[in-house]
Curated annotation (Swiss-Prot):
Signal peptide annotation: none
Enzyme Commission (EC) number: 2.7.1.19
Xref: InterPro entries: P-loop_NTPase, PRK, PRK/URK
Protein origin, superkingdom: Bacteria
One Gene Ontology molecular-function label: phosphoribulokinase activity
Keywords per UniProt: ATP-binding, Calvin cycle, Kinase, Nucleotide-binding, Plasmid, Transferase
Gene: cbbP
Source organism of the structure: Rhizobium meliloti (strain 1021)
Binding-site residues, ATP: 12-20
UniProt catalytic activity: D-ribulose 5-phosphate + ATP = D-ribulose 1,5-bisphosphate + ADP + H(+)
Pathway: Carbohydrate biosynthesis; Calvin cycle
SUPFAM superfamilies: P-loop containing nucleoside triphosphate hydrolases
Record's protein name: Phosphoribulokinase
Entry similarity comment: Belongs to the phosphoribulokinase family.
Pfam families: PRK
Length: 289
């Protein structure tokens, strides 16, 4: 953690909806005139697409499922050094992983490859969005560097539906290919992804209120209106629950540290919750300057 150079971390699995949360933060940053440096978790994959495919095949021959969820498939030591350096001096670097042709045109690199490393511009804070924002292993502790840690955790059937639809629509994969990826990733999901949500300050869990019992044949992603949000706070004593309940129509508290909100109020809920927290981080930063 660093009062002078705060770090916000959004952690979620593939298909969890972390990009939606990032979009809301970008709105807040623009409205509040806050400059942020951004890190995409994919930028710290250890291998490009072709090398990763070879590595998966090599490990499969040994009876091992090798996936992007694991620590070994990512440069977590480098990511931790970036977090630490930003926390100390407000500097660091990142790159982009190019997913498709649209991004290839934008970044000038082939799909499945990385762009060159680039230094951060001067910024008020650092924003990370990806798989490992709160990862703790035998060799790294990313959670210790973050000033605000947020988990995005849909119930798992909904997460799978979102992943299947996204990968088919934007990456051209078949349902069978996405299903195979989900199956291969399950041990790493349990060992590397889930434990991070016990370290977050706030978790957002979208829960569908329609039938999602077989996510592999679902023709539509449940809409926000067909969902509720369970929002859990690690330190509820610092949250103004009466204010949130008054501003978020039809919300209620399910536990002393949790509030349930209609699914179509996600953006409003995040803005009401995060804006004062960001202000606190920046007020602390300015006191240290």
């Amino acid at each position: 953690m660093s009062a002078k150079f705060p770090i916000i971390s959004i952690t979620g699995s593939s298909g969890a909806g972390t990009t939606t949360v990032k979009d809301t933060f970008e709105k807040i940053f623009k409205r509040e005139n806050i400059s942020a440096s951004f890190i995409e978790g994919d930028a710290f994959h250890r291998f490009d697409r072709e090398t990763m495919r070879s590595k998966i095949a090599e490990e499969k021959a040994r009876g091992v499922d090798f996936t992007h969820f694991s620590a070994e498939a990512n440069e977590l030591e480098i990511l931790e050094s970036v977090f630490a350096e930003y926390g100390r001096r407000g500097v660091g670097r990142t790159r982009h992983y190019v997913h498709d042709e649209a991004e290839a045109a934008k970044f000038g690199s082939d799909p499945g490859t990385f762009t060159d490393w680039e230094e951060f511009r001067d910024s008020d804070l650092l924003f990370y969005e990806g798989l490992h924002g709160c990862a703790v292993t035998d060799t790294v502790n990313l959670a210790q560097h973050c000033d605000l840690k947020i988990g995005v955790v849909p119930v798992i059937n909904l997460e799978w539906i979102q992943k299947i639809h996204r990968d088919k629509a934007t990456r051209g994969y078949s349902t069978e290919a996405v299903t195979d990826t989900i199956l291969r990733r399950m041990p790493d999901y349990v060992n590397y992804i889930c434990p991070q949500f016990s370290l977050t300050d706030i978790n957002f869990q979208r829960v569908p209120i329609v039938d999602t019992s077989n996510p592999f044949i679902a023709r539509w992603i449940p809409t926000p209106a067909e969902s509720i949000l369970v929002i859990r706070f690690a330190k509820p004593q610092s949250i103004d629950f009466p204010y949130l309940l008054s501003m978020l129509h039809n919300s209620y508290m399910s536990r002393a540290n949790s509030i349930v909100v209609p699914g179509d109020k996600l953006d409003l809920a995040m803005q009401l919750i995060f804006t004062p927290l960001i202000h606190k981080l920046l007020e602390r930063k300015h006191r240290m300057s």
